[in-house]
Amino acid sequence: MKEQMKIAIYGAGAMGTVLGGFLSDCGLDAEVDLISRNREHIRAMEEKGARILCAATGDTYTKQVNALLPEEMTEQYDVIFLMTKQKDNARTAGFLKNFLKADGALVSAQNGLPEELLAEIVGEDRVYGAVCAWGANLVGDGTAELTSDPSAMTMEIGSWSGRCGKLKEIREILSAVGEVTGNPAFVTVTENLAGARWSKLAINAAFSGLSVVTGLTFGEIAKGRKSRALALGILRECFAVASELGVKLEKIQGHDMEKLLGAPGFFGTQKALFLL
């Protein structure tokens, strides 16, 4: 009999709670653990389940989940989705290495460019990236607000080493989330992970900081003459650095990064609450 797959969401904050909640209730033949250092959040999910509030539709979902503190981990996992802030990645990866099966996959769903450091610690063939084009806020213990429409959420995944490895399995796992949310386009595979990373990084660099400082939505920044000029300058600098590194930028949800400010509608309902 085939052993049941074991999946961990390490860093089950806002986005980790959303992803882990859907993965726990999408029909996968897998054991899914949501792991966080936030004791109150973990205990609330243990007692009442993970609550997901969908801002776009007004729906509320309650998902029964396995919730753990890091010190309560005992299993080795086939796939670990890393969803913490990457400032502690060296320590976190060193810790998680002990909980990853020999053929396991560490999938960074973080912002920035985390894969190189992770690969140095756990091995390049075990490292994958997932670029998330959706957002969430933690609004209470055990409760996350999904700020994106479930039908428009996407995750673009790729292998750091360029070899397929467990990419097919990771895609199948995330495709199950697409099925339960009615979003067949939820997960796509890219052969240009670096390009996808740099595209997301450019958006965050150009819009997130300005959004925090001004209180404007991404769409308002793109429409305003002065804010648009600032964002465009930052984007150009990101494009130039990526080009020098030999990176070809990927589209995000079909939007060409080079034409981003000419079509701001995609960002109209987005708002950055934190510097990412």
Question: Where on the chain are the PLM-derived regions?
Answer:
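C-terminal active-site/capping subdomain that shapes the small-molecule cofactor and substrate pocket
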Residues: L249-L276
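Internal alpha-helical scaffold of NAD(P)-dependent oxidoreductase catalytic cores
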Residues: F99, I121-R126, T143-H255
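NAD(P)+-binding Rossmann beta1-loop-alpha1 motif at the extreme N-terminus of oxidoreductases
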Residues: K2-T57
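A structural signal for isolated positions on well-ordered beta-strands in alpha/beta enzyme cores
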Residues: A8, E31-D33, V107, Y128, ...
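Nucleotide donor/acceptor-binding cores
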Residues: M5, D78, M153
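Rossmann-like NAD(P)(H) cofactor-binding subdomain of soluble oxidoreductases
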Residues: D59-E145
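Short, charged/polar "capping" segments at the starts of alpha-helices
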Residues: E40-A44, E115-L117, G165-K166
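N-terminal glycine-rich dinucleotide-binding loop that anchors FAD/FMN and/or NAD(P) in oxidoreductases
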Residues: A50-A67, N204
